[in-house]
Each structure stands twice: as C-alpha cells, then as structure tokens.
Amino acid sequence: MASVGSTGNVAQGAFSAPCLLRSLGYVGVRSRSLDDWSEFAVGLLGMEQVERATPSRAFRMDDLSQRLFVDGAGEEGLGVLGWEVATRADLEALAALLDAHSVAVAWGSKALADERHVAELLVFHDPVGTRLEVFHTPEVADRPFKPGRPITGFRTGPMGMGHAVMHVETVDAALPFYRGLLGFHVSDYSLDPLHIYFFHLNERHHSFALVGSGRKGLHHFMVELGALDDVGQGYDLAQMQADRLAYTLGRHSNDYMTSFYAKTPSGFFVEYGWGGRIIDPATWQPHETFDGPSFWGHERLYLPDKERARLREARLDAAARGVRAPMEVNCPWLESVKRNA
C-alpha cells in the first residue's frame, strides 16, 4: 500500500462509491496558543479539558474520550478531520478503494491510534492537502462528561461531533473526491455568489461542506447544543470578549440552525448552535438553494461593508417573500418516533 502523501485524481461523474463513513468523529488543530484554546473550549464552548502529558490539549463533549484536540507543534490551523466507520472491514474496504484510485493511504500506527483513542485508523489526504483520518471503535471514557460551564450538553451520538466546512480554491477540485470516491451525499448547494456544497452522512443535515472561496483551510466547525439557552448564554459570554464574535446570532435557511460564530485562537470559526435540521437520508433529494444562507441575523462582522450589505439584502429579500421554516426541537424521543414511523 502506498505511503501517506500524494493524492490521485478522480474524474467528476466517472465513479460513485457507496459511503462507508458514518459521522464526523473528531477535529484536530495545530496551535501554539494552547492556553487560549483551553480558555475558549472550556470557558466559552463548555467542553471538558482532558489532561495530556504532551504539549497539547484535548477536550471532551460526550461519553467519548476526546472530540477536539490541539497540538502545540506545526503551522497554525486545521491539523486533521477524523471520520468514523463502523468496523475494521469498512476500513479495509475503504483502503482498497482508495488504493485502487491511486490515492496514497496508510494504516496509522498503534501509537497514533492510542493518541486518537480509537481502535484502528487510516491516514490519507484530500486533493487540496487536507489530512483525513478514518477510524473505527472510538474509546468510551471511564467517567461521565463534565462540562466546562453549565450547559445541558452537546448533540452528538450517531450524528457525530457536528460538522466541518472547508475553504477550497474551487469546488471542482474536491467535489469528485468527496462525492464520487468517498460517497458523501449532497444535501443542497448554492451557485451564487460562491459555489457551496453541503453533504450529509447521517440524519444531521450536513456533516461537511465545501466553499469555493478561492482560499484554503478550515472555515469553521460546528457543535450543536442541547438547549437554545446554552447558545444564548454562550452568546452573552462571546460578546463580553474583545473581537471574539464573527457572526451575530441568526438562523440558517438550509439546516435551520440557530447559532452564532466565534473566532478561535487559530483564526477560523466555531459555529455554536441549536435546533439543527434532521433529515431522512433514504428519501432526501439534493437541490439548489436560492434564499441566501440565513433567514435572519448572522451578520458577518469581519466582512467589508459591501459584502455585509449584499448578505443583508438577501436576508431582507427572503423575509419579504415570507421565507421561513418551523423550529426543529431537539427531542430524542420524538426523533426515535420519526425514525421508526
């Protein structure tokens, strides 16, 4: 099997593989601002910090041993996205598929698996250089999750950690890889003013997205809370910190998430949300969207005035046309009834 490094080409539309991936399992960040990350993840997001002997930080969100980790070495930014599959057989099938399409892939060492708190994993890169790890059997912690501040908890389970959104120079450079080779399912997409594709792996409206912004790197990752008040109280905290807020409170038009975005110590954003849309992957039909990214709010405080005005106009236009959607209530019992109906 090839070593980790190069990535082969997969022609758009030439191949479509079944998706073995189930959810976003973890996010790894590279940053020298470890103390700042601890304050951010624990004090604002409400994660639990886990003690580590190495110069790094790790954080819990649920019953698993870790969901977010920050490595103190390397260039500032995203280190890795970790995706979960069900079994070792799924890893073997994925490794064979990647190898057959000339994508360099390697099995992670036992030491790396222990560091990630998973049974086994594969390591490879997407066409734009993003490090991806795919694993099975994450380690369950031996004690309950203890949030860093009073929150009801995070919405994870079968839907995973949340979602990740990546900048790419052009969507065409990565779409064949994610949709064709890895089998990510398109939820919806927008072609104006930027090409943006949203993908699902489970009942969460999207676990991944590509934004053709002409840039590279992580735009944001999202964590979903168990109660709207968790988000509102986090919003209060974010507004008290200088230059922390990136997007004001608002509601997205495709996944119905009520959220705000906070700037991380590494420069990208975290979306902190509640009420995300639940879909039925078996019947969902991908479609183009035309109503702009948000029903209301989500003023992008970091953008130039001209760009903010354009997005504001899109929101006002959608409101004038009566575009809206019912709230999605986070109720495990109701979700189980929907699944079994």
At which residue positions do the language-model features occur?
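Short, charged/polar, Gly/Pro-enriched secondary-structure boundary elements
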Residues: 65-69, 129-132, 205-209, 267-269
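Non-heme Fe(II) oxygenase catalytic core, chiefly the N-lobe of the double-stranded beta-helix
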Residues: 138, 148-149, 153-179, 183
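Core segments of cupin and vicinal oxygen chelate
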Residues: 19-66, 166-206, 211
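A compositional/structural signature marking long, glycine- and acidic/polar-rich segments
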Residues: 190-256
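Vicinal oxygen chelate
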Residues: 2-15, 23-32, 73-97, 101-157, 160-169, 197-198, 242-341, ...
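Conserved donor-binding loop and adjoining core beta-sheet/short helix segment
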Residues: 51-55, 61-86, 109-111
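Conserved active-site tyrosine of GNAT-family acetyltransferases
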Residues: 37-42, 98, 129, 174, ...
